[in-house]
Amino acid sequence: MSTESQHLYSQLPAIDRLLRDPAIEPLVAQHGQTLISELLRQLQLQARETIKQHQRLPDWCADWPQALGARLAQQQRPSLAPVFNLSGTVLHTNLGRALLAQPAIEAVTRSMGAAVTLEYDLDGAGRGHRDRAVADLLCQLTGAEDACIVNNNAAAVLLMLAAIAPGKQVVVSRGELVEIGGAFRIPDVMRQAGCQLVEVGTTNRTHLKDYRNAINDQTGLLMKVHTSNYSIQGFTAAVDEAELAQLGAEHGLPTATDLGSGSLIDMAQYGLPAEPMPQRLLAAGVDLVTFSGDKLLGGPQAGIIVGKKALIARLQQHPLKRALRVGKLTLAALEATLRLYQQPELLGQQLPTLRLLTRPQQAMQAAAERLLQVLTPQFTGHFQLRAEPCWSQIGSGSLPVDRLPSYALTFTPQDGRGATLEALAERWRALPQPVIGRINDGRLWLDLRCLEQEDALIEALSA
């Protein structure tokens, strides 16, 4: 070790001395000596590494209390940070999907700070069932005989297969063997559930006779999977749920449909593309339907199974149900969300997902023009700003080929360099409330469909 390095190391104050610094003592009192000592130790290690690599002290060594405050703020920043979702994807899986309605937020808040009647029957003063209240609402809204709640739709499919067709064959069209995010495939779920997959038909065409010919004494379930994250078009044929349900009834076999997303309302009445509704499938004779809570439904992450009472009872009694069950916060949010559907006339304003999906393009255009006027002076000389029409997508595998007309504020670098755009996007992601846009065609696009706090965005981009 050189003499210069030894001199630099000797300038690093001991942690005990730093803890007695008048500017640091309040932080110790507020956050505890254990945490502050650990952060100071990290700073010392960082300083030692700088000396080792560059033969100098870090610039922040002139003010240890300030460096500690910055490290403390970084350490305490929540990993689930609120962001401005200007990506153009409303139900963005990586950004948490559906925003909860205010009644759902209030219900979760109430449940967090108090003991609740999760599994307590007030009438009989005994144990109740945690799914009961939500199941009753789902039965009212879908016409189902009963319902079961688990932690996501993949879990719903897994539980359904394991409880209804263990060790049996499950017949599915080859064109419906979907893969969802994270390389999670329907055939893999079937293997985990202990079922044997029987593919019928072809990728683009499957007929009722294909299902009929596959039925034997080992068949346990006839299943359809809604291809919610892709679309097969052209020379196609598929068996509808009513036909499959009739075939199942003829052979004494249950039928099930995995909707993936699923909607409890007719989206077409809001000017949106139609999405299969659980209640219509049940009315067509399907025995079990699975769908998600945090997609088009607009609630918390949950897997929902509705259908015949006897079949739901088998799901509730299966050992996997306890492993996959949801807690009080999910149930509180889901119950409050479902209650909004009892007032369909108000749903468009009360449910954030529906409100964002149905925003008229003129509203986003007006917002883009307002932002353009305010922000242009701040980026003059570096970026050209424009208000431009664009297309939003619903996201999370819902209506994959459908787009929603929207409007964006775009940023084009004056130097024409992609690196300049990347640097701008990186800087915005580092903001206290990160701004998430998308880079396309040499521009950074801020799709304004999901923007409901213009002033907050202006303040963030002006910082």
Curated annotation (Swiss-Prot):
Transmembrane region(s): none
Q: Give the record's GO biological process terms.
A: conversion of seryl-tRNAsec to selenocys-tRNAsec; selenocysteine incorporation
Query: What is a GO molecular function of this protein?
Result: L-seryl-tRNA(Sec) selenium transferase activity
This protein's record includes keyword Protein transport: no
User: Which top-level group of life is the source organism from?
Assistant: Bacteria
Pathway, per record? Aminoacyl-tRNA biosynthesis; selenocysteinyl-tRNA(Sec) biosynthesis; selenocysteinyl-tRNA(Sec) from L-seryl-tRNA(Sec) (bacterial route): step 1/1
Where located? Answer: Cytoplasm
EC number of this enzyme: 2.9.1.1
| Needed co-factor(s) | pyridoxal 5'-phosphate
**GO cellular component: a single term:** cytoplasm
According to UniProt, the reaction catalysed is:
L-seryl-tRNA(Sec) + selenophosphate + H(+) = L-selenocysteinyl-tRNA(Sec) + phosphate
Family membership: Belongs to the SelA family.
Q: What is this protein called?
A: L-seryl-tRNA(Sec) selenium transferase
Q: Which organism is it from?
A: Serratia proteamaculans (strain 568)
Gene name linked to the record: selA
